[in-house]
Amino acid sequence: MRSLHGTGVALITPMLPNGKIDFKSFKKLLRHTSKADYWVTLGTTAESATLTRSEKTAILEFVIGNNTKKIPVVCGFGGNNTSEVINELESIDFTGVTAILSVSPYYNKPSQEGIIKHYSLIADKSTVPVILYNVPGRTSSNLSDKTTIQ
């Protein structure tokens, strides 16, 4: 894995008034942030929970295809339905992706054991390293130190 260090930019998803992805603006965003040490695409800042699977695929392909400076790319893949996250992971080509950023399950408030099982299943299926995304203010659950180490 390429080392991630420095400043990463969490990319938004520019949208047109008709609800379609604005790839022209997205290209400008990539140029504007091209001095970042890495990009985070499809994270919570990109409002990925509101995107369809085909939109996510199109965005990831667009970012990878326009990554002329070969900036490391971290791709957000998370959710509260472990099976669906795994299904998405298995359907995506991660060529050009350095790691995935996976938010802990939200809404259903899993136990620490549930969080461990969730991340273990994702890590087993992922072809790239998994970064644990702990944001208790949004997920209503907090990764304990012990859970993170496991």
PLM features: residue spans?
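Active-site beta->alpha loop and helix N-cap motifs at the rims of alpha/beta catalytic domains
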Residues: M1-N142, T148
